Structure formats: C-alpha cells, structure tokens
UniProtKB/Swiss-Prot annotation:
Compartments reported by the entry: Cytoplasm
InterPro entries associated with the record: GCV_T_N, GcvT/YgfZ_C, tRNA-modifying_YgfZ, YgfZ/GcvT, YgfZ/GcvT_CS, YgfZ_barrel
Function: Folate-binding protein involved in regulating the level of ATP-DnaA and in the modification of some tRNAs. It is probably a key factor in regulatory networks that act via tRNA modification, such as initiation of chromosomal replication.
Species annotation: Escherichia coli O157:H7
Gene that produces this protein: ygfZ
Gene3D superfamilies attached to this UniProt entry: 2.40.30.160, 3.30.70.1630, Aminomethyltransferase beta-barrel domains
Protein name listed in UniProt: tRNA-modifying protein YgfZ
A Gene Ontology cellular-component term: cytoplasm
UniProt-listed GO biological process terms: iron-sulfur cluster assembly; RNA modification; tRNA processing
Binding, folate: W27, W189
Length: 326
C-alpha cells in the first residue's frame, strides 16, 4: 500500500514541540551506485566523501564551474554507493548537472521515490523511537541502519531524527506513533532546519550562491584539503582571499505575509528602509511568530531591524546554534 503524506499543521518552535512525526515530502532522495561512485562524487561535491564512514552523514554542496551551488546535499553511504537528501524542487536539475560527466564513469545516478522520508522530533523523540528500533543514532554514530531503514541523527535545534525507509516500515512507524505523536508535514521540519541554521536551497535560489554565503564552511560541508571538484577554484578563493562577503542569518519577528524564496527584505537605515538580502526560506509558527532564513552581508550589526518589503511589522536577528569562525 502506498504511503500518504500527513496533513499540515502550523509548525512549532523546537523548545515547545511535542513529540511529532513528519512526512518530508518537500525533500527528496537520490542515489549514486556503481564501481566509480565514490571517485565520481568526490570530483563533484565540496565535502571529502572519501573520508566518510558508514556512521556519518555530511552536508555538502554541488556547485557549477563558478562555485555557485546547484543544491546542497545531506550525504550518507548507502549500499555500495551513496544517497543524499535535498529539496524536491531542485532534485531534477541537480541530477541533470551531476550526470553531465558521468558517461565515462561506471556509475548510475537516479532519483529514489521508492523510499519514504520521515522526521521525528520533539518531546522525548529518542524514547519513542527506542521502543521501535534496536539501535538509534547519536553524536558518536550519526547514521544507523536496521533492515530497510536508515536513521540519521541531528543535534540542532534540538535532538531529532530523519528516517529513510520503505513504505511498509513507514506505515508501521505511523501506526505505532499515531497515539502519542502529533502528525505534521514538511513545514515543521523546514521550521527546525531554519532554526538550526541549515541552508535551504529551493529552485528560486539554485545557482545563486557560493557555499560560504550559506555558512557551509561552519557546518563542516567544505573540505579545503581534498582534490579537484567542480567549482573548487572559486570556493577556495572565497576562503583564502576573503572574497566572500555574505552569510546566512536567522531572523524572527512578525510579518503580515511570508516572504518567498528569492525575495529581498528591507533594512532600517535611520528613518528609511533599504533593500537587502535574499530569502532562502520562511515559516509562520503556531504562536504567530515568523522565522526567516536569509543570505545577507556578513557584517550586519546584531541589533539591525528588518521587515518584509513595505510591511508594518519588523524582524530582528537571532543567534544561530553554531559559530561562523572556521
């Protein structure tokens, strides 16, 4: 039987989130398999995949020749190759770009819609899953595989789990958790990713930013020691010549409408407002608060005031759960 996504509810901030099971239908899975899969991927993404163990998942960027990201990927080893999770809106163009040089390599690159992506977060998430799986991932071992299921562990903004599994297990999980967990859709996971400062690259922002403009260096997503990959020269230049002047920021406050991906905001300058930044993602929480993930200059004053264009409400900067010092 097919697996049906859960209906939406207004998302909640991590500090107040009850136990919640989410369908992650705005995210999508893809795989690379074959004898050359590690070597091929190593030449295409910013992370050092040759150093990855079975116990790790990594954030990485897949860039064009100018170092601009087609997408960012949550990578893990899968079977005899690798799998990654990215926003569904960018998967098709990202895979088309990744396949461009694959004709000379023994690899198969494909979308994977057979498996289901679920998120578990909120109050006592670990205890709830411990009743179902014999082993759970943790800080020391961030990926655990059990049967048809792969579990990924995330620390921020509060402990949570991403589950990659087959339809039968997804239905079993839903049945077991239905009584104690709230059910929600991708918007809740998106809200948690915004709070965690994990960059969200949707179609509107694909091909727009170098990885450092979205804090990937602070999230362990760029290796400056590995060999060549597409876009490496520009990514290295941004680090060693200080060419990157942008960073990912978290804003909270209120707005009469949600800004869309690719839209700019306005920064208060004395009595006036000046357009600034590019929105990556925004969500309205159940308490009415709006959270916005935006790329702006990396030297913003911490007490700066922003607004959605021409709006009467304001947004301010919230600290991210990680440091931008490399």
């Amino acid at each position: 039987m097919a697996f049906t996504p859960f209906p939406p509810r207004q998302p909640t901030a991590s500090a107040r989130l009850p136990l919640t099971l989410m369908t992650l239908d705005d995210w999508a899975l893809a795989t690379i398999t074959g004898a050359d899969s590690e070597k091929y991927l190593q030449g295409q993404v910013t992370a050092d995949v040759s150093q990855m163990t079975d116990d790790q998942h990594l954030l990485a960027a897949h860039c064009d020749a100018k170092g601009k990201m087609w997408s960012n990927l949550r990578l893990f080893r899968d079977g005899d190759g690798f799998a990654w999770i990215e926003r569904r809106s960018v998967r098709e163009p990202q895979l088309a770009e990744l396949k461009k040089y694959a004709v000379f390599s023994k690899v198969t690159i494909a979308p994977d819609d057979e498996r289901v992506l679920l998120g578990v977060a909120g109050f006592q998430a670990r205890a709830a899953l411990a009743n179902i799986f014999s082993e759970l991932p943790s800080k020391e071992k961030q990926v655990v595989k059990e049967g048809a299921t792969t579990l990924l562990w995330f620390e921020h903004p509060a402990e949570r789990f991403l589950i990659v599994t087959d339809e039968a297990t997804a239905n079993m999980l839903t049945d077991k958790l239905r009584g104690e967990a709230e059910l929600n859709n991708s918007q809740q996971w998106l809200a948690l990713n915004i709070e965690a400062g994990f960059p969200v690259i949707d179609a509107a922002n694909s091909g727009q930013f170098i990885p450092q403009a979205t804090n990937l260096q602070a999230l362990g997503g760029i290796s400056f020691k590995k060999g060549c990959y597409t876009g490496q020269e520009m990514v290295a230049r941004a680090k060693f010549r200080g060419a990157n002047k942008r960073a990912l920021w978290l804003l909270t406050g209120s707005a009469s409408r949600l800004p869309e991906a690719g839209e700019d905001l306005e920064l208060k300058m004395g009595e006036n407002w000046r357009r600034t930044g590019t929105v990556l993602a925004a969500v309205k929480l159940e308490d009415g608060q709006v959270v916005v993930q935006v790329v702006m200059n990396n030297d913003m004053e911490p007490d700066s005031i922003f607004r959605v264009r021409d709006d009467a409400n304001t947004l301010c900067i919230e600290p991210l759960p990680y440091s931008l010092e490399e």
